Amino acid sequence: MDDVDDDSTHCEASPLLPSNDNDASRWPIRSRWTELSLISRYSLPLVATYLLQYSFSVITTSAAGHLGQDDLAAAAIGVTTMNICGLAFFEGMATALDTLCAQAYGAGNKLGVGLHVQRMLLLMALATIPVGALWLSSPALLSLVLKQENLAVKAGSFLRVSLIGLPGYASFEAGKRFLQSQGDFDTGMLILVVCAPVNALLAWLFAFCLGMGLEGAALGAALANDLRPVLLLLCIAFKRSSHQCWPGLSCRAFRGWGPMVRLSAAGSAVTLAEWAAFEVLTFSTSYLSTMHLGAQTILTTTSVVMWHIPFSFSVGVSTRIGHLIGAGLVSAARRVAVLYSMLFVGIGLMDAIVLFSLRNYIPYVYSADPEIRDLVSRTMLSVACFQVFDAAICGCNGVLRGLARTSFAAWVVFFVNYLGAVPLAMWLELGPAGMGLDGVWTGLGTGLVVIACTEVTYMISIDWRRCVDNVKYREE
């Protein structure tokens, strides 16, 4: 295909770059800028969406920090457990829709988009049962792994209250993919623009005005989570253009779960392996002191806030690659993947510079304890360097999701993290090296370098045309 201008008459699956394999050298600069413009239109609303979504945890942690040191530590443990034993699964499951819905839309099977979403909602409903049982039992379970009994009780109570918002969290993750696969990345953002202030208001009201403490902050976040899918459903009902992808409630939603389950399992494994690495190390800092636990909570929260920027771009990349692969445009997909690799390195460097520049100011957002603030400031350089490699991993995983090759990423992340990075981080933190929190981030960063090199090598070696054939087989 020849060079294509930014023409509104082209659909979202149209290539903006020459798709002929023989035209690789004839890639005009304006096509590169047009592609970057498109991915920015996809991703910038997603950055706002995910940052606003993550603000729910930040607001809860911040409220806990102003309640007291024990409340901050309990919130850290509660959020950690909530992420590992719940949210990571649902977040990972939803990434399967980044693949399935985008490829179905690109292949012209628009009704398949809604069918994939229906299947995912059913799967998430089933997954809520064991997750809910685990959260209800959390006070007793946490007391088995924590030395401080009072922290186990506080964190367990936090999780029980948070369970109220779990169905809303899960269904919103699936529902917003229905619109994103059609190129609508704004609606989810606008919903969170409404819900984030509601969360802050409810957390302040319940925690401080009504004297409910940490449980009040958790309740505010839970109710705001349940509001999100309600507003999303209303938006879809009034957005008639999205109805072209809705087949109506269908018995077919109970069949053909194979691809979705496989991609959901792989997506959950990737997310869980990444998140759990942080959370295991957060637990390990409790063996240093409560102060170190509070500082690590702030550092992890800040790092994850920054991570949402490259992750948001990676979701946009998944959608774009999925559209191109679904439409059979292999050459264009390969070239934009190269372009995106440079983009993610730039994002990582930007994140690192921002964190290091603000290292003496960020701690004041979370804590009034001067010792915690000083420890956070001294460790921020390691966290800043970590961002460069974390952004590169987001880019790799975004391309792999678009190709429906998430399972490879799952294996790589799991083995590298738990056979190398996490043990190294714990040895540097607690072992003879005595690096403390700097050791945590150095160990994890070393693992990211290995993961990035492995995934890039894999993407270069695989047959992208076979990915197209798999889409045709599934969607036809």
What are these model-predicted stretches?
Residues 2-46, 101-168, 195-202, 207-265, ...:
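Short alpha-helical transmembrane segments in multi-pass integral membrane proteins
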Residues 399-400, 407, 411-418, 428-431, ...:
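C-terminal structured "cap/appendage" subdomains that terminate the fold
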Residues 47-59, 84, 88-96, 129-136, ...:
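Hydrophobic alpha-helical transmembrane bundles that constitute the permease/transmembrane domains
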Residues 47, 51-73, 142-149, 205-212, ...:
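Helix-terminus/linker motif at the lipid-water interface of multi-pass membrane proteins
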